[in-house]
Amino acid sequence: MKSELHIIRNAKPEEYGTAGQLMVQVYSQLEGFPKEDEQPSYYSMLRNVGDFTAKPDTELFVAVSPTGNIDGSVVFFGNMQYYGSGGTAIQEKNAAGFRLLAVNPNTRGAGIGKLLTVHCIIRAKELKLQQVVIHTTKAMAVAWKMYEKLGFRRSEDLDFMQEKLPVFGFRLKL
């Protein structure tokens, strides 16, 4: 997928570290989101986000600027069995999911988060799946609004607690 300024594609192995560092930067700056000293294992997972690609049907997408900067990333799961979050999401059948969407703070407002999200939706349709499952938190208010505008609907059956953090589930029927 392509925008006027960014191309969305699979990350190359040599880009995994950059994508992970971007995720750490973005998530650690979210007001109301746990910091690294509160959830060190979560931040370790972010740093090592490329490890997800070793799982079947799992892809790391990046938004690449014309100058080669990685300005966004997201992990796509073509099989919810490998989604790896809390709650019941891993039991969803005929569904895709995505997690860990992050956009460079210097490029926010340019539609990169939407491009990455739409790319995941298109990928789920290519795989002939019936729904896309995601999670977000209250700290991610901008993403929450974007997901709703794209047609995602709250699904309380997917909610869970990540230590002390409430995590809210959403579905998009395809």
Residue ranges of model-derived segments:
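Extreme N-terminal starter segment of soluble prokaryotic enzymes
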Residues: E4-I7
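Acetyl-CoA-dependent GNAT
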Residues: N10-G17, Q21-L100, N104, T117-H119, ...
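C-terminal "cap" of GNAT-fold acetyltransferases
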Residues: K12, Q25-Q29, E92-K93, Q130-V133, ...
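Conserved amphipathic alpha-helical interaction elements at protein-protein interfaces in regulatory
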Residues: Q29, G109, I122-E126, R153
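Flexible, active-site-proximal loop/turn residues at the rims of small-molecule/cofactor binding pockets
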Residues: M80, T107, K138
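Conserved acetyl-CoA-binding loop-helix of GNAT-fold acetyltransferases
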Residues: V103, G109-I122, K149
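Conserved GNAT acetyl-CoA-binding A-motif
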Residues: T117, A124-H135
